[in-house]
């Protein structure tokens, strides 16, 4: 013997097993506490469904509405909410300590675009060979980046050395 499948969502029409319900009609007016079978009859006469909107209340609150339309609206609302959610990505900008001015400007434009999109930016400064002896140049460059983006971004992870590279993470304000 298998249990009947459980339905998602509110109980409707004959699934409501309470003797009385607090009825709200299609216009949103309170009709008061009435027997469930009378509420179902009223719903059928109006060509609507009796939908339980607040099952935990005593007596449960039920509303007269078109269940198909109600379900569609709820689905639409959920989809809109899902679209508005944006996962914050961490974009990476790679530089060298002796970066040329034009290259630096191009990297900064890309960084500003990432901030406008709401993404975090990881600035990676890579040292090669003897450049490791001049880490202060890297710190100067990262401080310059930090000062330029100060109005629109905040430092989430201050510059630190990891192996042969210096890393700083910035997040939009």
Swiss-Prot record:
It comes from the Bacteria. It is found in: Cytoplasm. Its main location: cytoplasm. Transmembrane segments: none annotated. One of its GO terms (cellular component) is membrane. InterPro entries: T_IF-3_C_sf, T_IF-3_N_sf, Translation_initiation_fac3_CS, Translation_initiation_fac_3, Translation_initiation_fac_3_C, Translation_initiation_fac_3_N. The keyword DNA-binding does not apply. HAMAP family: IF_3 (MF_00080). PANTHER family: TRANSLATION INITIATION FACTOR IF-3, TRANSLATION INITIATION FACTOR IF-3, MITOCHONDRIAL. IF-3 binds to the 30S ribosomal subunit and shifts the equilibrium between 70S ribosomes and their 50S and 30S subunits in favor of the free subunits, thus enhancing the availability of 30S subunits on which protein synthesis initiation begins. Monomer. Belongs to the IF-3 family. This is Translation initiation factor IF-3.
């Amino acid at each position: 013997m298998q249990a009947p499948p459980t339905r998602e969502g509110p109980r409707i029409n004959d699934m409501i097993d309470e003797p009385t319900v607090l009825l709200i009609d299609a216009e949103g007016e309170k009709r008061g506490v009435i027997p469930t079978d009378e509420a179902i009859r009223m719903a059928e006469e109006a060509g609507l469904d009796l939908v339980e909107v607040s099952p935990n209340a005593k007596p449960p609150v039920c509303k007269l509405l078109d269940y198909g339309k109600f379900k569609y609206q709820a689905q639409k609302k959920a989809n809109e909410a899902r679209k508005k959610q944006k996962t914050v990505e961490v974009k990476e900008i790679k530089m060298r300590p002796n970066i040329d001015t034009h290259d630096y400007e191009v990297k900064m434009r890309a960084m500003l675009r990432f901030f406008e999109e709401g993404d975090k930016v990881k600035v990676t400064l890579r040292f090669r060979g003897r450049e490791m002896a001049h880490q202060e140049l890297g710190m100067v460059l990262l401080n310059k980046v930090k000062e330029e983006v100060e109005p629109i971004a905040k430092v989430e992870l201050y510059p630190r050395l990891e192996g042969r590279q210096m890393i700083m993470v910035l997040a939009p304000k």
